[in-house]
């Protein structure tokens, strides 16, 4: 797994400050390279974790085979194209098979681990669905992610408040429209 090289980050941040015409030794900026290095170590900590490891503990003795939904999971990530934040909520629904349940917090941890790396929203959505499908082997998985991207808010098109919504469906949710509709209605229910 990756280890953050804080010294390299500090050097690079100093160079960026100089490249934009700033004095990295002035008051207010002198500690910025160190602060940015510590911040990157934190916000990219998912690079040193395997998201599927969070799903290794199962409650296989349970006989629950009805829909499980964890919704409004807050997350933040960093767009790999511009290295600016995007943030929002993830919703995960799965239909357990054979009583293979995981702790609810484990689903949130999968999202956190995927989000804490240079990332694309589409990849978080797809990878979360694939990992849950592979590890829990449910009848189906549905993942919906909605986020605001600072690369659309702060620069370029400058559309603050716009949201991007992505979804990934696996298993029964691909074919059974009623099951998919039930999960989606529960996600949108206030």
UniProtKB/Swiss-Prot annotation:
InterPro entries: GTP-CH-I_C/QueF (IPR043133), GTP-CH-I_N (IPR043134), GTP_CycHdrlase_I (IPR001474), GTP_CycHdrlase_I_CS (IPR018234), GTP_CycHdrlase_I_dom (IPR020602). Belongs to the GTP cyclohydrolase I family. It is an enzyme of class 3 (hydrolase). The keyword Protein transport does not apply. It catalyses: GTP + H2O = 7,8-dihydroneopterin 3'-triphosphate + formate + H(+). The gene is folE. GO terms for cellular component: cytoplasm. Its EC number is 3.5.4.16. Toroid-shaped homodecamer, composed of two pentamers of five dimers. Pathway: Cofactor biosynthesis; 7,8-dihydroneopterin triphosphate biosynthesis; 7,8-dihydroneopterin triphosphate from GTP: step 1/1. Disulfide bonds: none annotated. One of its GO terms (biological process) is one-carbon metabolic process. GO terms for molecular function: GTP binding; GTP cyclohydrolase I activity; zinc ion binding. Zn(2+) binds at residues 79, 82, 151. Keywords: GTP-binding, Hydrolase, Metal-binding, Nucleotide-binding, One-carbon metabolism, Zinc. It holds the Pfam family GTP_cyclohydroI. This is GTP cyclohydrolase 1.
């Amino acid at each position: 797994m990756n280890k953050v090289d804080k010294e390299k980050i500090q050097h690079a941040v100093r160079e960026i400050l100089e490249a934009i015409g700033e004095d990295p030794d002035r008051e207010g900026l002198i500690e910025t390279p160190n602060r940015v290095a510590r911040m990157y170590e934190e916000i990219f900590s998912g690079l040193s974790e395997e998201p599927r490891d969070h799903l290794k503990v199962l409650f296989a003795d349970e006989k629950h085979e009805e829909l499980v939904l964890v919704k409004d999971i807050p997350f933040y990530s960093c767009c790999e194209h511009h290295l600016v934040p995007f943030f929002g909520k993830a919703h995960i629904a799965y239909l357990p098979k054979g009583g293979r349940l995981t702790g609810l917090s484990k689903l949130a941890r999968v999202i956190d681990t995927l989000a804490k790396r240079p990332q694309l929203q589409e990849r978080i959505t797809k990878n979360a669905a694939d990992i849950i499908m592979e590890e829990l082997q449910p009848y189906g998985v549905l993942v919906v992610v909605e986020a605001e991207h600072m690369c659309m808010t702060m620069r370029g098109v400058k559309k603050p408040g716009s949201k991007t919504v992505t979804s990934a469906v696996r298993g029964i949710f691909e074919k059974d429209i009623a099951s998919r509709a039930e999960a989606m209605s529960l996600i949108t229910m206030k």
